[in-house]
Amino acid sequence: MKRHPGGEDHTLALLKRSGLTPPARILDMGAGAGEALALLRHQGFDAAGIDLEPRSPQVAQGNFLRAPYESASFDGILTQCAFYVSGDPFAAFQEARRLLKPGGKLMFSDVWEETQAVAIPGFVIETVEDMTPLWREYFLEAIWNGDCVPLPRGKKFRYLAITARKEN
């Protein structure tokens, strides 16, 4: 099963929309088994990954809400299906902002409450793609396989892919 809606093609599309080129330094926040990390490295990026429960020796073990990296040390942050399950997505955005260099790029795809405006404090939104239909298919497959995080009842969600630039 793909670890996020759209799989590798979606990761490559986010990268393209970001405008980042190798050898830019990119951190995968919530890297899991390291599939996107391996893809980034294969593309020529200087990439690192962090996850609470890494499933690859290439991924550092740690809490990305308090990542053990210097401020302003990355050109890009990639996160797919990770900020929502962190329990504090807004803290995750703040940490991403801390880690990015001025003008650095955030490549984000995750669930988003339908009632919330598409705005991320400290970032200028550059592109937004609503991937909700693809996410629904992915979510059904995850439920079938017993590999999903339940969503709160009474709220509506959509799945967005966003590229954003850190405000200076």
Regions found by a protein language model. Give the residues of each.
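Conserved Class I S-adenosyl-L-methionine
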Residues: E126-N168
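A short glycine-rich, Lys/Arg-flanked "PGG" loop and its adjoining helix->strand segment in the class I
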Residues: F90-K105
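A short acidic, Gly/Pro-enriched loop at the edge of an enzyme's catalytic core
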Residues: L65-I77
